[in-house]
């Protein structure tokens, strides 16, 4: 096999270059035609049944309202009961014919089976599955004392989506429905203190890309990679190395700094349009794509910049990171001109 690999190593770059010069322009023209058609004839989700996990806040909440405005039946899932019922009531006011709130923990296999089956039993079908539930562990890998405390990142962010997809896929095949996987820009771009979060989102992207090859046209899959969106996460709610959820505004200032925080409403509108067009991917905001290109072609540069900006040094507190200092300067500047702070 080694000689064959040597031949492929020599020929494949040449064939790839030729294909890019000859095939790629035609491919892009065809994609443009398909894109125009999808924009002219988007999917109508009125009357369709949609399951949204992590629906009590953030992107999940905003998507519930967007689907509701378009007349979809909703099964909203979250582990937090009170805010979930509030979102369900608002989604009906926005126009959903019927909303079923379901309190469940997506990290538990039996809970996922229960709410998928409850949805199908109640509404008689399932058309869209939005896997949105997630947590953000935020700490340095070397600071971990008990590695088992890191498991919620994979249990919720990755396995929670896998469990839902496992039980929903037979019904989605019947309706030729769609999975909307809410991943993250961190699934493509590494960031200090987010090792488990980045890993879980990268796994999610790879999982759904593989399912595309298995499901073919039976189930559509839209993989969404948002940037920093206004949510509990962007406001400083993180999972500590002990597995507890806490609000840490100082750590939030270090990690988010002056990055533009997109409103959940704007992000949800972009996702909704992308889903109705049948897009395979959505980067929201689109400038994330430029960062990914920098990572592909200049990975050493992007990694060095991330380390320099977000790491304070071995003997310094985390609040001494350059990102925090940049934020302090920006807020001082905005105070001088009486502008709202970041």
Regions found by a protein language model. Name each.
Residues 121, 136-151, 193-196:
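Conserved mid-core segment of classical short-chain dehydrogenase/reductases
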Residues 184:
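Residue(s) in the substrate-gating loop at a strand-loop-helix junction
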Residues 81-82, 103-115, 147:
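The beta1-alpha1 cofactor-binding region of Rossmann-like NAD(H)/NADP(H)-dependent oxidoreductases
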Residues 165, 200:
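Active-site helix of classical SDR
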Residues 49, 56-57:
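Conserved glycine-rich cofactor-binding loop
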Residues 213-288:
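SDR active-site lid
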Residues 70-87:
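Conserved glycine-rich Rossmann-like NAD(P)H-binding loop of the short-chain dehydrogenase/reductase
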